[in-house]
C-alpha cells in the first residue's frame, strides 16, 4: 500500500518535430493541471474598485431638493464609517448572536399613514358584490335542479 502512494506521473519530453511545428505556428500552451489550481489574485473587497472617478454615476440636480454630488459623498463616507464601527469577528471564530435593537413606535410608523375607513368601504363593496353573485348563482342552480314529489317516489 505504501508503494501505491509513491506513484507519480512524469511527463515525457516533447519530440523535436512537434516543438518546431508549434514554434512556427505560434502555438501557446494551455493551462495545465498545476496552473489551474492556482487562484488568481482578487482585488480587495472594500468596494473601492468600483468607486473610481470615471466609474462613478453622473449626478444630475433637476430640482431644488435633489441630492448634490457633495451630499452623496457625505452619505457614502457615513456608510463607510458605520461599516468600520462594526465589531470585528472574535478571534476564536465563534459566531455570536445578539438581539436586534428595538425601535420606538415613532420610528416604526414614521411616514406611514393609513385610513381604515377607506379599507372598510372597499371591503364592504367587495362583500356586497360577492353576495349578489352568490344569490344569483343559487337562483340559477335552483331553477335548473329537478324536483321530485314525494308521491312520485312512493309509486
Curated annotation (Swiss-Prot):
InterPro entries recorded for this chain? DUF4604, KIAA1143-like
Question: Which domain of life, per UniProt?
Answer: Eukaryota
At which residues is N6-acetyllysine found? 108
Q: Name one Pfam family in it.
A: DUF4604
The residue ranges flagged as biased composition, category Polar residues, are 128-147
Q: Which UniProt keywords apply?
A: Acetylation, Phosphoprotein
Q: Which residues carry this modification: Phosphoserine?
A: 50, 130, 147, 150
Q: Give positions of region: Disordered.
A: 24-63, 80-155
- Recorded protein name is Uncharacterized protein KIAA1143 homolog
Q: Which species is this record about?
A: Mus musculus (Mouse)
Amino acid at each position: 500500500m505504501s508503494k501505491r502512494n509513491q506513484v507519480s506521473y512524469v511527463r515525457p519530453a516533447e519530440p523535436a518535430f512537434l516543438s518546431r511545428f508549434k514554434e512556427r505556428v505560434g502555438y501557446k500552451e494551455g493551462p495545465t493541471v498545476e496552473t489551474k489550481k492556482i487562484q488568481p489574485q482578487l482585488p480587495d473587497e472594500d468596494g473601492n474598485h468600483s468607486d473610481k472617478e470615471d466609474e462613478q454615476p453622473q449626478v444630475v440636480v433637476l430640482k431644488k431638493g435633489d441630492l448634490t454630488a457633495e451630499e452623496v459623498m457625505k452619505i457614502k463616507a457615513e456608510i463607510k464609517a458605520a461599516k468600520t464601527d462594526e465589531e470585528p469577528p472574535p478571534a476564536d471564530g465563534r459566531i455570536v448572536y445578539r438581539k436586534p435593537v428595538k425601535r420606538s413606535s415613532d420610528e416604526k410608523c414614521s411616514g406611514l399613514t393609513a385610513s381604515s375607513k377607506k379599507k372598510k368601504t372597499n371591503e364592504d363593496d367587495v362583500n356586497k358584490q360577492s353576495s349578489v353573485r352568490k344569490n344569483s348563482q343559487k337562483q340559477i342552480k335552483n331553477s335548473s335542479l329537478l324536483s321530485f314529489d314525494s308521491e312520485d317516489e312512493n309509486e
